[in-house]
Amino acid sequence: MNSYLDYTIYNRGSNTYSSKVGCFPVEQEYLPSACASTNSYIPEGRPVGGNTFTSAPHETHGTSYAQIQSQPFHLNVDMGKTGHSNFCKQTRPPHSDYGHQHVLTQADDHMRLQSPGFSVVNMGANIGTYSESNCRPGSVSASHYQSYAYGEPEPHGYGSFSKYQVSPDSDSDSKTNIKQAPTFDWMKVKRNPPKTVKVAEYGIHGQQNIIRTNFTTKQLTELEKEFHFNKYLTRARRVEVAATLELNETQVKIWFQNRRMKQKKREKEGTAPVIKRVTLCSSGQNADHSTSSSPGASPTSDSSTAI
């Protein structure tokens, strides 16, 4: 028995027992042979991919180390019911001080590691589907691998996902919803673009077009007085009135145009003739109450002179 163990140890190379590289805690359970690091081993006495080989921690439960070595590993265990990392659990050997390493025997010729790094946490409840495919020689069919709904898992992660990809169908649906949005009537109203203000030579903005001007009481009184005497203003008079009332020429011109339209509207409605009669009556009363000493002309004398 000892010679067999010596044979298996001496054929593993000079760096079989390394300084605890890639080891796991004693309490942690993980894959003994399928979870090998990059320093994997092909059972022909040649290390592949590195100088060390990481194996599983073992716990002593009354089984000798030699018996464990002589027994072949059978990884075709259906662990889908358990759903955690009890995958191929072994017991701890007495040589746990040597980096928790485990030496493969010649009975393990059928085991070929498919990937150097294999995380059990990424498996979830689907451990049973990976048990045989990871230790079988040759390629593994795509049906053994489960698809991930939220992207591809990280190569050396612990169950986390590196990319949370959104399906392209949801993006296309959102774009179609935006394109098919209903168009309401108030969206069809044609709006005039804002008027651009021309900049003067020295960077001073020109006068903006003001829709409505709020005149003061004094300005309205002076404009009404000017309209009473002259319904139409010359350009010189318009400039003078605008300078007196602190307005521009355009404002005075527009006010007179609106005042004339209002006067025509009043005449059509019949309110303007009443105002004329009142003015005539008031002028007649002023003539009767005049202080002149000359008597008024009689109608007979007027008729005789006309003849």
From Swiss-Prot:
- Domain of life, per the record? Eukaryota
Region annotation (Disordered) maps to 159-178, 265-307
- Gene3D superfamilies annotated for this entry? Homeodomain-like
Where does this protein reside within or beyond the cell?
A: Nucleus
Main localization, broad class: nucleus
Return the motif ranges for Antp-type hexapeptide: 183-188
> What is the purpose of this protein?
Sequence-specific transcription factor. Part of a developmental regulatory system that provides cells with specific positional identities on the anterior-posterior axis. Acts on the anterior body structures. Seems to act in the maintenance and/or generation of hindbrain segments.
- Official protein name in the record: Homeobox protein Hox-B1b
